[in-house]
Amino acid sequence: MILIKNVEVYSPEYKGKKDVFVSGGKIVLIEENINFENEKIKIIDGSGKKLTPGFIDQHVHITGGGGEGSFKTRAPEITLSKLTTAGITTVVGLLGTDGTTRSVENLVAKAEALKEEGITVFAHTGSYEYPTVTLTDSIKKDICFIDEIIGVKLALSDHRAPNVSNLELQRVASDARVAGMLSGKPGIVVLHMGDGKKGLQPVREILEETEIPMKTIRPTHVNRREELLEEAFDYAKAGGKIDLTCGIKEHFTPGKCIKRALEENVPSENITISSDGYGSWSKYDEAGNLVKMGVSSVSSLHNEFKDMVKELDFRVEDALTYVTSNVAKGLEVYPRKGCVEEGSDADLLLLDENLDIDTVIANGKVMIENKEIIVYGSYEQI
């Protein structure tokens, strides 16, 4: 049991200075003043700090991405403390380019491991590839019968994409949609968007030709070039959900793109931010040769949030929505996740006056305290 005293609560909307009592992995009470006399209750002084929902990063290569530069460029698996020190208490894992030396089986095993270590984890079946790599040989069965799997990954308009036809894209989306309905899950298609000239055109075409709801198809990396970004804004205006990626280009940071989106009357609730953490970033020349590559960090999510507040003048409560409540609603786990409310999961961050992460609580357990790692993942300290 944990009692956080005298803390400024952002749910993400500002609630004022409160006391927050946590027990059994849940937020039990949020009141002006809570006093319990019990040695079993851990007291945390929240004076001068902000209490926010834990960040939800819906695009992380938890088993490592990369591989486009041969075997030596396969990125490593992520560790628990890399996520918690970045304020991430819920993560969605997925594969990337490589569905050949990587597998959905390994992805689900890693998801299970991170869950055992204390955070909340979901996953998507598939990779860039088509036919889709799965665990059960069926998109529908993966989503229906594997607890962690809530959707499917596919790539579009990219030189690494499988160049699916509109009919094939329809079938993937239909399978995800129906499986989600049958299992009570989002049943979404996370669509990696590349630099290809077609952009979102295939998506627009299949939505016009079918009854597939817009919410089923979630394009990500849409801030990688101007034309794609404008297409994505139109998509979000029409009711679709779009995901902006941290660290793509200086002039296309998520915060700057959201500023533009709001000026163009794009509904803010249809925009989310993710890190693409532990995926590789790569640069290619005009002939398609790999020139440079590296690995993205999950800490970019927290850094982007800070920049939005400190450099771009977003209010704390507004900047938080793009990494908490908007994401939770899109994943259909709100209000269990993504907010600070009585009855919600106790996934909480304490931020200091500089918005740096002081304390992280995941499912009611203290993972980081006073900027010190309390809980490490298996083998992290070897």
Question: Language-model features: where?
Answer:
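Histidine-rich, glycine-flanked metal-binding segment
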Residues: 1-2, 9-52, 373
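Divalent metal-coordination and catalytic microenvironments
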Residues: 7, 20, 25, 48, ...
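C-terminal cap of metal-dependent C-N hydrolases
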Residues: 7-9, 24-27, 339-382
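Active-site gating loops and adjacent loop-to-helix segments of metal-dependent hydrolytic enzymes
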Residues: 66, 70-73, 78-93, 142-157, ...
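Divalent metal-dependent hydrolysis catalytic cores, especially in the metallo-beta-lactamase
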Residues: 78-103, 109-131, 146-162, 181-195, ...
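Active-site core of metal-dependent hydrolases
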Residues: 160, 168, 175-282, 290-291
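His/Asp/Glu-enriched, well-ordered alpha-helical/loop segment
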Residues: 264-349
